[in-house]
Amino acid sequence: MNRLAKTAWHRKASKPVTVWMAALVLISLVHWALPNYRWVLIHMFTLGIVTNSIMLWSQHFTEKFLHHQLPEETRPWQLRRFAILNVGILLIITGQLTKDMFAQHWHITAVGATVVGGSLAFHAGYLGRQYLQAKRGQRYAPSVIAYICSACCLPLGALAGAALAAGFPNPWQERLLLTHLILNILGFVGFAAIGSLMLLFPAIWRTQAHYERAPLTFALMSIGLTTAAGGALFGQGLIVAGGLVAYLIGIIIPIMSWGACVVTVLRDPRDRVTFAAVSVAAAPLWLCGTLIVLAYRAATDLGTTAVSLPTMPFLIGFAAQLLIGVMSNILPSNIGGGPKATRTGMLVYDRAGLFRATLVNVGLACWLYTENSWLRVVLSILAMGSLAVFLVLTPFAVRAQLGVIRKTREPLPLAEKPKTNQITAALAVLALVIASFGGLVDGGSGGSSGVVTAGGTGKTTEVALDMKGLRFSPDVITVPAGNQLVLTVRNSDTMAHDLKFDNGAHTGRMNPGEQKRLEVGVISADMAGWCTIAGHRAQGMEMTVKADTSGGSAGGADTVRPTSVHKPTHPIQNGTDDSLEPITER
């Protein structure tokens, strides 16, 4: 049986990854039409793409690391396991898409989570059996242990996710969310990633590295993960931070060895600095940086109830970049056909490689820094689009490699040195984009430009404002003319929002669960406010401040800080209530 026939099962098992990638790109183009679209896009990536990839490649590398090839008659059952997994993923996403349709939607999500968790639990047992049956003393056996730990984490993360879908009163909901992220990103993805990179990093950089402290690395990661997840579940921020630091120390051990690989290659780069190489080097750095940020936030918010989760750096900087970089290298290697054929496939995947790698990493950093909504949109397109190009390149790479194998075309020649001019070009594109939007700093984000706080009646009206379901509640506020308006703004939605007024008062970007105090200024005339996040105003996220010129509440020289209480006359629907009128209590 030839090599292409032997890997037929592998190509079939990888089809769900391709389908989910294509679906993610298409859905992102019309995401505004979906309910809870941010959750849907994130979980299409994490469940659809990442989970299928980890289950496939952990099986692939377990066989390689243990030198124990499974018989071909086991492959049909493996394909059925992928089918079962994807049924569970579809159920989870369906449950969340029907969230606004009926209250018991979480039952669908819970069933899906059970199927997904059960699939990975079985996968962990399957890998464990292979480990026990293999010969002892295999060099990369610790990486197989990492795959088993990875597969054991997802059922626990799925359980936390099902509990989130059911809904628990605070602070349990916030605790479950942080636990869910720690188990799934640091546990499921983290163990699989570090376990694979023990071999793949030096292979992709085409140099040698020592593999000496893998047991210590995985022991520290395990201790850190268990500690952080337990601390998150019980609301102990310092324990979470301590666990994250232990996890960070664990992954720094191999990163130091990988850094030596990079230094060695840069002394004589030749054709070795590619998109895949830069991606697998940058992804662990994003993981380290994000761990530091999350540990700091957990330590400074001891109850963990308001910890802002750095989701995008985890998912894009670490998980997505690592996945695309690794696949750009191992897919041609898996097809095989000799050095020239494999090199041709890799070179096709590396088209504009350094240009794309720069857009991903520098573009993502700028995207996370700026609060300018439309600039964030453009930068996100550049960063994620540079990764999505993988889908376009795949058929060309496969066709070119098979052409060399079948001797219908010549192999592509090696480059003599890295194309560093691509880095310059990418930086120039980013600089042009940023300059066209007036720079990274949004001039109106400070909340003070143009705001008048002196004069008027000397009195202050304070109002609590909620943002949820692409609406402000209340969306009309009446304030005595001459009073200063101070808002306590809370984002109770599942996506980021902000609030900006005609006079320049601006909350800045607010993540879900965040709360800010905004001094709007003295109200002398009616004034409009809106959410500046791209597309939100067009969907109706606007409000009005009306100046009451009747004079009934004016007068008095002393500063009074009343509290505005909003009493609805009918049940609130979708987080809004047009009947709310401020009642000033002195």
Where are these regions (language model features)?
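Short amphipathic beta-strand segments in non-cytosolic proteins
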Residues: 501-503
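Extracytoplasmic/periplasmic beta-strand context in beta-sandwich domains
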Residues: 42, 181, 311, 497, ...
